[in-house]
UniProtKB/Swiss-Prot annotation:
Annotated spans, Disordered: 56-75, 110-131, 1216-1340
UniProt keyword list: Repeat, WD repeat
Annotated transmembrane regions: none
Top-level division of the source organism's lineage: Eukaryota
Comp. bias regions, Polar residues: 1216-1251, 1286-1318
Subunit description: Component of the TSET complex, a heterohexamer composed of tstA, tstB, tstC, tstD, tstE and tstF, which may act in plasma membrane turnover. tstA, tstB, tstC and tstD are likely to be the core complex members with tstE and tstF acting as associated scaffold proteins.
Ranges for the WD repeats: 208-246, 250-294, 345-384, 397-436
Taxonomy of the source species: Eukaryota, Amoebozoa, Evosea, Eumycetozoa, Dictyostelia
Identification of the protein by name: TSET complex member tstE
Length: 1340
């Protein structure tokens, strides 16, 4: 039995292109929205008022060439008239013009005006519907609506135009069905008022969007669907599930019908033909998208919709008929000089047309049941079926009001069906007895038939009908040649399309509160392939929420619908696809394939797979597929359709290939047609044909490093194990399994865990164990360990295990297991303890039984596939899965992953009865998943940072990283790989081009790339600063930018980038910071300039005094500033060695270490986060008898800075808690210091081991000075030395307040700031006496 299922789903954006404005999605502007439109709106209302007053006075105005109002049959001409009343009126493009039409109607249109006819009581009414528009007022799609419109009602479907009449405004909704007559309209009902245009307009705006396709059709040969919406035709590739092309027509027209004209040679190529609502025919070449010709209708005022159409098979000729028409219009595109003509002969309107698939025969049927056969060579009718006296149920044919005609794909017979269900099947129409009825009967009794099509391969036809319950059904019917009747086919059960909610792809928050029901009205089937779709139409009971004018404030219009969704169906060969199908061998990648340089790009030589008939191989390097065994492995002569006598139907389920011994194992289901029984069997065969073993078995697996094979018996209670060798397969040994086992899976674990069993009876996964417990040396390790001594994983009662994959790392001796079930994916350790898992989403709409389809280990990242995406997940359970790429086809089974693409097995959409596997590849980017997986390892799998860095460098060098997400960059910065993160982000040219200067600045700032950050910051600052008359938003942005610049300048100072900091503070006019930097750089010119500016301002006396003190300094020393460093090796203090100190975020003046007089060694653990030096952690101090410098260099040094300008700046600018009491710069001790530590100090006082006395800087990732402010202010700072000036010693040794630094004026190499600090400290002693001095810790 076959089954109908969804094979693809097309989703197209419901948005208007920028190049045109379609009337079907006109913006309905309700109110005075734009200030610049007030005058235009006022002018329009004046014109409407004038026309309304003149409506009863200008019924028959004379024709005029240059008048303002034209009436009668002539109307006004296009050159002069502004308003046309009656037929024929026109107008300039910049004015309001009436469109053409007959009668006394008034038409107000945009541009050339709306078309249609109407009476003198309608404005823009009639066939085509008029439009009111204003060119130059936000395009030609602006519409004014009256306020007094309570609701909108409908009698048909979604619409496309808005027109104005005497009772208000109507929104016209055009029919999507070819069987429904003229388009209906949604009337915006309002009471008749004296002036419908004088009301105040509310201030609201809505978009009228289409939510269904106007028409659909398939390519004659390729798997391509053409879908029309508004004036667009979208080309949708069913295999790749993507839109591959788009065509446009005039924006004022709407496409209503599509049909393809198949060609059989270069002279007669395939054409795509479109009928518009206005009656124009467009012809394209779909391969080149070139417009071939445009054909206008015979009568310009004929606005009737097309009811039926058909195309010649091998000639570009189209036949169609319009509503209530008795003629067939013929358009021959082959003869370019010919005009459309008509075939006449029917007495009643034509109901159906069908062309013979191979011959020049056309069949047509009218509403009175008359069937005529035409010869298209001479356009003459040679058969007329009017007499049904020989048929006993002739009277029933008269009860049908509509008929359907369909030819069998080869032309063997013609099916004629009435809407009542009576069906007549005529044989060969060119035979001697063409009127012979070879079969007849009633179909779909008690139902209303909507559409009939014939399957392109199977001998059956599909009927779409509406059942008594009101739901649509799709049934299949075939001819019983023995009894000459028409019976329902047992091959395909009745299918009820699940399309009543075509907006199911939207979330519940995006849907309108009330949704119209979407009904299928016709079947659209592929001419040669196994695809079909359903043309949809909205039901007649559309509520007011479809209106652009919602009934209440909580209702949502259809402007929220931004996509159109359409399902494409196919007929599968089986009820469901087995999860292990397609049958392709797995090539797992060893650990380190991408991480280690020597393993990268070692491509596998070939991939072996079973295509359903042959064993083949796929070469990844060139994409060539070849047969490995010439003889077919599996042949289904019954074609899967239940015929063929005693033949068997086979379906492969599992395929394994052993590369070492060049043999494969195949598990397949064999269905006996004669016995009506199904068995599961196995086949073991080598490529040379020397080994060929078959038998009964439900599952198999290679175990013991692929040296053995285990076959699971049919009942799941027997395991048959054989040893493999180059000579063949040994005899099988049988082992009893208790309880019943469902499937078996291999493991890389040693010892007893050689097999992993899935027991559905117990709903668990268990390992095997040794049968002979008394003899561990025995290798019979196949007993089920139901007690769980080795580990057990309990599953849900209805959970089924499909696939298990292992990843083993010899470096960390870890084994990780990934388990794929029908409900979730589980990652466990070697004892089946869950590390991470993801569940399938609730109520997922999939044709297969499982949401997940396959899994594959890529280093420490697990890749898995769904029906739409390739995803990845890591070993951290707090990270959500992320997509890698979309999948064009489904379902697929991953075979292997290469650095630039993935290779997978895929079952193509084939003719029913065939089961075929193909191997394909798809380009993907795997850099992100590799990096995230490596940086998201759990605690029990840890690598050294140097190894991680080498792995990351190898990945980046070998793989493409032109596209990488922000999540990866943040993860790298989080793990201190800032340099790598910035280099990646800087090389992403595509991504960089889309970022603003502010975003680039933030990215460089985060990555500690100060020069690049300053460059981008300057660009953004210059851009905003030149804006004249900025608004409030721009002012807020500028203030925020200044804050970022201030913080960035401070950080540049902390990192030693003084020139960059100076550039920032110059833009901000931060004079104190500029003076600080100038003194640090010994830049006297800058100090003079700062002083001059301060004198002009006259508001900063402290700054002036500081400048004077510095400039009055007589001794001028050379500039010698040692920037902050990460590491200070063991050193001897000299007269030329200066060290910078940090207070909060500000670095103070460098100090010479020889100026320190005394120090205090602290004997307790010291923390830089202490509130002050008088805290409890600093009470145990030794007397200051030790002289500076220390002899062993094994202590950190804590000093307090003198009262310098820097301390003044730090205190003055400390408004955001930038200052801490103590900070530290580290130094690495020498090996001699470490050796003497245990002898000099007692480590027991610090509650730690000797190896933890000093900081280990081996893990520092960056060599730049950006990490200078990363201190060791924690409990690991075991011993520190506090310095206290001798002149300020108090009786209490724990009270440390300040430090005196001696000046050495004779030392010209000493930094000038050391001396300046002492002099400036005397400048404002009175000002600073009440200011607490920050304490700075220097760790040498």
């Amino acid at each position: 039995m076959l089954k109908i299922g969804i094979c693809s789903s097309i989703t197209i954006s419901n948005s208007i292109s920028n190049s045109y404005h379609s009337p079907s999605t006109s913006t309905v502007v309700v109110g005075n929205q734009l200030q610049q439109q007030q005058q235009q709106q006022q002018y329009v209302q004046q014109q409407l008022q004038y026309q309304y007053d003149s409506l009863n006075q200008s019924q028959t105005s004379p024709n005029s060439n240059d008048g303002n109002i034209g009436g009668g049959s002539g109307g006004g001409n296009n050159a002069g008239s502004n308003i046309g009343i009656g037929g024929g009126g026109g107008g300039n493009n910049n004015n309001i013009g009436g469109g053409g039409g007959s009668g006394g109607g008034v038409n107000i249109g945009s541009g050339s005006g709306g078309g249609g006819s109407g009476s003198n009581s309608n404005i823009g009414g009639g066939g085509g519907g008029g439009q009111l528009g204003m060119n130059g007022m936000n395009g030609s799609n602006m519409l004014l609506i009256n306020q007094n419109i309570p609701t909108i009602k409908s009698t048909d479907s979604i619409g496309s135009t808005v027109s104005i009449n005497s009772t208000g405004v109507s929104l016209q909704y055009n029919s999507l069905s070819s069987t429904i007559g003229s388009p209906s309209s949604l009337s915006l009902l309002s009471p008749i008022i004296s002036n419908p245009f004088s009301s105040t307009l509310p201030n609201q705006s809505y978009m009228v969007n289409q939510i269904l396709f106007n028409c659909l059709c398939f390519h004659p040969k390729s798997p391509i669907l053409y879908a029309a919406i508004r004036n667009e035709v979208h080309f949708y590739d069913i295999i790749t599930k993507s839109v591959i092309g788009k065509l446009f027509i005039d924006p004022t027209e709407t496409i209503r019908h599509l049909i393809t004209l198949p060609g059989n040679s270069i002279q007669t190529p395939t054409f795509l033909l479109a009928f518009t609502q206005e009656g124009v025919i467009y012809l394209w070449d779909p391969e080149t998208h070139k417009l071939q010709t445009i054909v206008h209708q015979l009568k310009l005022d004929d606005k009737r919709p097309i009811t039926c159409k058909s195309a010649a098979p091998n000639k570009p000729v189209i036949f169609f008929s319009k509503n209530e028409s008795k003629d067939i219009v013929v358009v021959d595109f082959h003869n370019k000089g010919s005009s459309p003509f008509k075939l006449k002969g029917h007495k009643k309107p034509i109901s159906a047309i069908a062309h013979h698939p191979a011959k020049t025969i056309l069949a047509s049927c009218s509403t009175d049941g008359q069937l005529k056969i035409w010869d298209t060579r001479n356009n003459m009718s040679f058969l007329n079926f009017e007499e049904f006296s020989s048929y006993e149920n002739t009277r029933n044919i008269e009860h049908s009001n509509h008929y359907f005609l369909v030819f069998e794909p080869t032309g063997k017979y013609l099916v004629m069906t009435g809407s009542s269900g009576l069906t007549l099947v005529y044989g060969d129409l060119t035979s001697q007895n063409p009127q012979e009825v070879i079969a007849n009967g009633f179909i779909c009794k008690g139902q209303n038939i909507l559409s009939i099509v014939h399957h392109p391969q199977l001998p059956l036809f599909f009927v779409l009908s509406i059942g008594p319950s009101g739901y649509e059904e799709l049934s299949s019917w075939e001819i019983n040649n023995q009894y000459k009747t028409i019976v329902q086919s047992p091959l395909i059960p009745t299918f009820i399309p699940e399309i009543n909610d075509s907006l199911s792809y939207l979330s519940k928050y995006s849907k309108p509160l009330t949704i119209p029901k979407f009904n299928p009205v016709s079947i659209v089937i592929h001419p040669t392939k196994n695809y079909f779709s359903l043309q949809l139409e909205a039901s007649s009971n559309i509520s007011s929420t479809i209106s652009p004018y919602p009934s209440n404030i909580n209702s949502q219009p259809f402007s929220s619908i931004r996509h159109i969704n359409q399902n494409i169906y196919s007929i599968n060969s089986y009820d469901h696809l087995n999860h292990s199908f397609p049958l392709v061998s797995k090539l797992p990648l060893p650990m380190g394939f991408f991480f280690e340089p020597e393993n990268t790009f070692n491509y596998p030589s070939e991939i072996t797979f079973f295509d359903g008939t042959y064993v083949k191989s796929y070469l990844p390097l060139n994409g060539i597929t070849k047969k490995l065994i010439d003889t077919p492995i599996m042949v289904n002569s019954a074609s899967g359709m239940g015929s063929g006598g005693g033949e068997d139907i086979s379906k492969g389920k599992k395929f394994l290939f052993n590369n070492e011994f060049q043999l494969f194992a195949l598990i397949y289901d064999s269905f006996s047609v004669a016995a009506q029984a199904q068995l599961s069997k196995y086949l073991i065969m080598d490529l040379q044909g020397l080994v060929n073993q078959q038998g009964d078995g439900s599952d198999c697996v290679f175990i013991g490093n692929n040296q053995q094979i285990l076959i699971l018996g049919l009942d799941g209670k027997l395991a048959k194990v054989a040893t493999l060798s180059k000579q063949g397969v040994s005899s099988f040994k049988n082992f009893t399994l208790v309880p019943r086992i469902t499937s078996v899976h291999s493991t890389p674990l040693g010892g007893n865990k050689v097999v992993l069993y899935f027991c559905q009876e117990k709903s668990c996964l268990v390992f095997s164990k040794n049968v002979n417990q008394s003899d561990p040396s025995c290798k019979d390790n196949y007993m089920v360990d139901i007690d769980g001594d080795n580990g057990i994983l309990q599953l849900q009662p209805n959970e089924k295990v499909f696939q298990i994959e292992w990843q083993s790392d010899p470096k960390s001796s870890q084994h990780i297991c990934a388990i794929l079930t029908n409900q979730r994916i589980i990652i466990t350790n070697s004892r089946l303890r869950i590390i991470n898992q993801i569940h399938s989403p609730p109520n997922h709409h999939q044709s297969t039984s499982s949401y997940f389809q396959s899994i594959f280990w890529l280093e420490w990242t697990l890749l898995y596939t769904t029906s739409t995406h390739l995803m990845y997940m890591t070993l951290q359970n707090n990270q959500a899965p992320k997509p890698i790429s979309t999948l064009s086809i489904s379902p697929i089974i991953l075979s292997t992953i290469l650095p630039d693409r993935m290779i997978f097995g895929y079952q193509g959409l084939q003719v029913p009865g065939k089961n075929e596997t193909t191997v394909r590849c798809q380009a993907i980017g795997i850099l992100e998943c590799l990096i995230i997986g490596l940086l998201s390892l759990p605690p029990f799998i840890q690598y050294e940072k140097k190894y991680l860095s080498s792995c990351l460098q190898n990945i980046v060098q070998k793989l493409d990283y032109t596209r990488i997400s922000k999540h990866v960059l943040d993860k790298l910065r989080e793990r201190s790989f800032t340099d790598l993160a910035y280099s990646l982000s800087n090389d992403m040219k595509i991504s960089q081009s889309k970022q603003s200067s502010l975003e680039k600045f933030r990215m460089a700032w985060i990555s500690k790339q100060y020069e690049a950050a300053n460059r981008h910051l300057s660009i953004e600052f210059n851009r905003i600063s030149i804006i004249k008359n900025p608004n409030d938003t721009e002012k807020r942005q500028f203030n925020k930018l200044k804050e970022n610049m201030r913080d960035f300048g401070r950080e540049c100072m902390n990192a030693g980038h003084y020139l960059l900091a100076k550039d920032c503070f110059q833009k901000l006019s931060e004079h104190i910071y500029l003076l600080q930097i100038s003194i640090l750089l010994n830049d006297r010119d800058s100090v003079i300039a700062i002083k001059r500016d301060a004198e002009l301002r006259g508001d900063d006396h402290v700054l002036l005094a500081a400048c004077d003190k510095y400039l009055n300094k007589q001794n001028k020393s050379i500039n010698k500033v040692n920037p902050p460093v990460v590491k200070i090796l063991p050193w001897d203090p000299t007269a030329t060695t200066n060290v910078s100190m940090k207070s909060g975020l500000d670095y103070l003046s460098p100090i010479n270490l020889n100026s320190i007089q005394r120090y205090y060694p602290i004997s307790l653990p010291f923390s830089g986060a202490s509130a002050s030096l008088n805290g409890g952690k600093h009470k145990l101090l030794r007397p200051p008898e030790e002289s500076w410098p220390p002899e062993d260099f094994k202590h950190s040094v804590a000093i307090t800075p003198p009262r310098t300008l820097m301390s003044l700046v730090a205190n003055r600018l400390s408004t955001k808690s930038h200052m801490s009491s103590t900070t530290t710069l580290r130094r690495s001790p020498s090996i001699e210091n470490i050796r003497t530590t245990s002898t000099t100090f007692d480590s027991s006082k610090f509650n730690t081991d000797n190896q933890e006395l000093f900081d280990d800087d081996s893990d520092d990732d960056s060599d730049s000075g950006a990490d200078a402010d990363v201190d060791s202010e924690n409990e690991e700072d075991r011993k520190l030395v506090m310095t206290v000036p001798a002149s300020l010693q108090h009786n209490d040794n724990s009270s440390l307040t300040n430090i005196t630094v001696t000046d050495n004026d004779s030392n010209l190499d000493q930094d000038i700031t050391s001396n300046t600090g002492s002099d400036i400290a005397d400048l404002n002693d009175t000002q600073l006496s009440s200011t607490p001095t920050p304490t700075t810790t220097l760790s040498s």
